[in-house]
Structure formats: structure tokens, C-alpha cells
Curated annotation (Swiss-Prot):
A single cellular component GO annotation: chloride channel complex
Organism: Caenorhabditis elegans
Family per record: Belongs to the anion channel-forming bestrophin (TC 1.A.46) family. Calcium-sensitive chloride channel subfamily.
Protein name per the record: Bestrophin homolog 2
Topology term for the membrane: Multi-pass membrane protein
Gene expressing this chain: best-2
């Protein structure tokens, strides 16, 4: 399920975000606790063996390995690999969320263009909304495990009321000669919805061909967005990229188990506190491994993690709200004057508590700048490189060269168009 924490961060106060660190569901602690335990156990075993079970020559040999690994640990470009990959994954996640679909536009247009209060008109509108919701459901069954568990068979879709038994028989009658994997029939409910608009227009429930075209365009847009969900599920990011990132992070900390071992004090020439717990390495593990877990969670938002998309809730919302929108809701309030009709300056009300909060209304950033008090003090002239000025100068030059008999006083006369300046 989606973990919503917006209520806890209504302000940017430090304490508000500090409290979020103690949340468990959907948290970084839940994501990395198993890896952290394994890392600390492995680190502790090697540390105990190094300090207690090795002879002094073996310790010195092991210390050489520690120094070798520590100096070359930075060869793994962890920040670059993680940063670039998380940018791609977040962009992909955002585009997927934009295409999962809310049915409101289709239903609002169906309610607007398919006119009538008769039972048949209502059935037309409800079928259009239901077929669009069915298109989304069929896609979600094949991309989301949560929806697949809810609707394991097409018979359960019928039992849930998204389609009738006759509609299922008609749906199953569309067969392909190819393998079933090449013949997914997501398009059938969308085609039914488009056919409903044609029949509604033919029966006179849609008043014009333009309204019919608008209705069909919105259904096509809905189907196209659902198709993008299929496309993203069909062609994920190249496998080698997640493999590379996962390999880089895990190898980095595998080497860190040795590279970050603290050398026994008596074997070193510099002073350093001998601690048994790798504090800074532990913090680094949390940040980098947590970064990797963020990528893994967002890579497939249709999975079953705490913060994956609520596909079942979206299906429920679309079918219930969609049917409600088209179910004879064309009645509008009586045409009345609003309470501000005769007021020149509208005075709006606030609750007593919120009335004390100051509002910042938009003003242009330079709208309050006053450069000159009087208009007469501003002299307006053409730009020095304007096209008009250049053409005028060329014309004057040509006149002086071609008409040598022009009166000397007229030759240098200021053009009338510029006298006002």
C-alpha cells in the first residue's frame, strides 16, 4: 500500500522530519535491515578472526590486504552509477504514474455529450464508462500481482460486475491464430466503448458528429495511456543496467568488509582510536544501500512493495466514480445571481483562525519600480540599430549621391519624421 506522510510534514520544521525517521512501513529501515545484519555479522566475524585467531605474521599479511583494498576501493564509481540510474528510474516512475489513468475525463464527456434521461441513454453512458474501466482492469491483471490475486480468472471479473456473462462469451470468441501471448485482447472493451458512441449518435442521443468525435477522441486517449502501461511493462530497462548497479553496490561493500577493518594499534605508526564497531562504514552502508533500495522499489511500481501503485484502489475508484458521473447527473442548479453580483470589490471571508494569516498576492517583480515621475521628462527616439533607421540612412545617402543638383540647404535637412524628436 502507499504510505502517505504529507500530514506529518505540513511545515518544514526539523522535528517533523525527525519523527519520520521512526516510521517503519515503507521506510529505509525495513528495506535494508536484512542486508545490514548480514554486513555487520560478516564484518564482525572477520574482525574477531583477525584479532584473536591469527598469528602476528598472518596479521601483518592481512593488514597488507586491508591497505591494498582500502586504497583501491574508490575505483568503483558508486556515486556516478547510482546517481545516473536513479534519475532514469524516477523519470520512468513519474511517466508511469501519469499514464495509469483516471477515468474522469471520459465520464464527464460521456455525461455531457450523450444526452437524455431515459433508461437507454443512461445505459449508453454507463456502458461507455464500464468498458473503459474494464480496459484498465484487464491491463492491470497482467502487469500487477495485486490485481492478479484479486481477479485470478476472467470469471471473477464477471462476478465482480465489470462485465456480463454474455460479454465474456463475446470476449472469448475473439481468437487469434498465434500464441495467446501474442494475442492479448485489451483492445476489445475499448472497441466496445467506441461502438457505443457510434450507436448513441445513430439513435440520436449524441446531437452532432463533432460531439461524437470529441467523445471518441477522449476514449482513444484513455486507451493510449493504458497502452503505455503495457509498453513499459513489456520493455523494461535493459537488464544489464540493474545488474551493473546491483553488482557495483554489493561488491563495494563486500570489499569494504576487509578494506574498512581497523588495524591493531601496535602495528601502526600513527595514532588512531581503536574501535570495534565501524561507525562511518555503517553510515555509508545505510546511505548507499538505501539508495539502491529506492531504485529497486521504484523500478517496478506495479509490484507488492509498501509504496507501489494502488492498482486495486484505482480500479475501485474509477468504476464507482465513473458510474456515478454518468448516472443521470446532467441536472444543474438553477441559474441564479451569485452573492457578489452587485459588488464592485469582492470581500471574501476567512475563518477566524485563518484570518490572522497574512497572504502574499502576486505582483510583478518590477511593478513597484518608478523610474520617472513625469511623462514629459522621457524622450523617445528610434533604436540606433532599428531597421527603420538603417533604411532611412541608406536612402539619404543614395539621395545625396544620385541627385547632386539638390539644393544645398535641402540636402542636409532633418527628415520630417524625426523632427518631433
Amino acid at each position: 500500500m502507499t504510505i502517505n506522510y504529507h500530514k506529518e510534514i505540513k511545515t518544514s520544521h526539523t522535528w517533523k522530519f525527525f519523527v519520520l525517521l521512526f516510521r517503519w512501513k515503507g521506510s529505509i529501515w525495513k528495506a535494508i535491515y536484512m542486508e545490514t545484519i548480514i554486513f555487520l555479522i560478516c564484518y564482525g566475524i572477520i574482525s574477531v578472526v583477525y584479532r584473536t585467531a591469527m598469528s602476528e605474521p598472518s596479521q601483518r599479511t592481512f593488514e597488507s590486504v586491508i591497505r591494498y583494498c582500502d586504497k583501491r576501493l574508490s575505483f568503483i564509481p558508486l556515486e556516478f552509477v547510482l546517481g545516473f540510474f536513479v534519475t532514469i528510474v524516477v523519470d520512468r516512475w513519474t511517466k508511469l504514474w501519469r499514464t495509469v489513468g483516471f477515468i474522469d475525463d471520459v465520464c464527464l464527456l460521456a455525461n455531457l455529450y450523450v444526452r437524455g434521461t431515459s433508461e437507454k441513454a443512461i445505459i449508453y453512458r454507463r456502458n461507455i464508462a464500464r468498458y473503459c474501466a474494464l480496459t484498465q482492469l484487464l491491463v492491470f491483471r497482467d502487469v500487477s500481482m495485486r490485481t492478479r490475486r484479486r481477479f485470478p480468472t476472467m470469471e471473477t471479473v464477471v462476478a465482480a460486475g465489470f462485465m456480463s456473462k454474455d460479454e465474456l462469451d463475446l470476449y472469448n470468441s475473439y481468437t487469434t491464430k498465434n500464441n495467446s501471448r501474442l494475442g492479448k485482447k485489451y483492445w476489445i472493451p475499448a472497441n466496445w466503448a467506441l461502438c457505443m458512441t457510434y450507436k448513441a449518435r445513430k439513435d440520436g442521443y449524441i446531437e452532432s458528429d463533432y460531439f461524437k468525435a470529441q467523445m471518441e477522441g477522449e476514449i482513444r486517449t484513455w486507451r493510449t495511456n493504458i497502452e503505455w502501461v503495457c509498453n513499459y511493462d513489456w520493455v523494461p530497462l535493459p537488464l544489464m543496467y540493474p545488474q551493473l548497479v546491483c553488482l557495483a553496490v554489493n561488491l563495494y561493500f563486500l570489499v569494504s568488509i576487509i578494506a574498512r577493518q581497523l588495524v591493531i594499534e601496535k602495528h601502526k605508526m600513527v595514532d588512531e582510536v581503536d574501535v570495534y564497531f565501524p561507525v562511518m562504514t555503517f553510515l555509508q552502508f545505510i546511505f548507499y544501500m538505501g539508495w539502491l533500495k529506492v531504485i529497486e522499489v521504484m523500478l517496478n511500481p506495479f509490484g507488492e512493495d509498501d509504496d507501489d501503485f494502488e492498482t486495486n484502489a484505482l480500479i475501485d475508484r474509477n468504476i464507482t466514480m465513473g458510474l456515478k458521473m454518468v448516472d443521470n447527473t446532467m441536472k444543474t442548479p438553477e441559474l441564479l445571481k451569485d452573492q457578489f453580483f452587485d459588488e464592485v470589490l469582492v470581500s471574501l471571508l476567512y475563518s477566524e483562525e485563518s484570518s490572522q494569516i497574512s497572504n502574499y498576492h502576486y505582483h510583478g517583480s518590477t511593478s513597484e519600480v518608478h523610474l520617472e515621475q513625469k511623462c514629459s521628462s522621457v524622450r523617445m527616439i528610434p533604436h540606433s540599430q532599428s531597421e527603420y533607421t538603417l533604411k532611412h540612412m541608406r536612402k539619404q545617402t543614395l539621395s545625396r549621391s544620385v541627385l547632386p543638383d539638390v539644393n544645398e540647404n535641402e540636402r542636409w535637412k532633418i527628415p520630417t519624421s524625426l523632427e518631433k524628436f
